[in-house]
């Protein structure tokens, strides 16, 4: 049995996630896997990914991973990253596709009308680079991470939870958006902890020790 299963549905380079977790938890068994049985048996699950939402949902289903993701998200420490966060919600404007429906709400694109910086210059989409993450509620995943710490983002869409109680952090890029959500055993982030230097490594270490 793996201590941590990183779900591989063919979207994104997952080795960087695995290497970061192995760095903070050298004694743990980390599996990058597309095998539903390995995911089901793991103590903790990481659901990362990059790419377009329609492609991600299709590849997830082609590998028969939909149900095991839903089961894991209901039963064990579960970390969603980037598109892995977005897929947890009910619907995405990207391709007008349904998500997994694990969390209430949708996924929306940065509004063009608001993509203006304080100096009047246009903000580019995708939002790419370092940005502050403002913590909106206490959570064990924030342990040792200062409020307004900077994390690394690459995205054109963001989650819009239907339940405000889900919001664990917000960030600003032309508009204020939800950058982390939390409910029970689920914690999911829009940014990339594996690309976010020491703060990101601390978050991954927190995930390894988190006991929801």
From Swiss-Prot:
Coiled coil: none
EC identifiers of the protein: 4.3.2.10, 3.5.1.2
Keywords for the protein's UniProt record, in alphabetical order: Amino-acid biosynthesis, Cytoplasm, Glutamine amidotransferase, Histidine biosynthesis, Hydrolase, Lyase
Pathway: Amino-acid biosynthesis; L-histidine biosynthesis; L-histidine from 5-phospho-alpha-D-ribose 1-diphosphate: step 5/9
GO biological process entries: L-histidine biosynthetic process
Segments forming domain Glutamine amidotransferase type-1: 3-212
Reactions this protein catalyses: 5-[(5-phospho-1-deoxy-D-ribulos-1-ylimino)methylamino]-1-(5-phospho-beta-D-ribosyl)imidazole-4-carboxamide + L-glutamine = D-erythro-1-(imidazol-4-yl)glycerol 3-phosphate + 5-amino-1-(5-phospho-beta-D-ribosyl)imidazole-4-carboxamide + L-glutamate + H(+); L-glutamine + H2O = L-glutamate + NH4(+)
GO molecular function: glutaminase activity; imidazoleglycerol-phosphate synthase activity; lyase activity
PROSITE patterns xrefs: GATASE_TYPE_1
Cell compartments where the protein resides: Cytoplasm
NCBIfam families to which the protein is assigned, alphabetical: IMP_synth_hisH
Family annotation (HAMAP family): HisH (MF_00278)
Biological function: IGPS catalyzes the conversion of PRFAR and glutamine to IGP, AICAR and glutamate. The HisH subunit catalyzes the hydrolysis of glutamine to glutamate and ammonia as part of the synthesis of IGP and AICAR. The resulting ammonia molecule is channeled to the active site of HisF.
Subunit details: Heterodimer of HisH and HisF.
UniProt protein name: Imidazole glycerol phosphate synthase subunit HisH
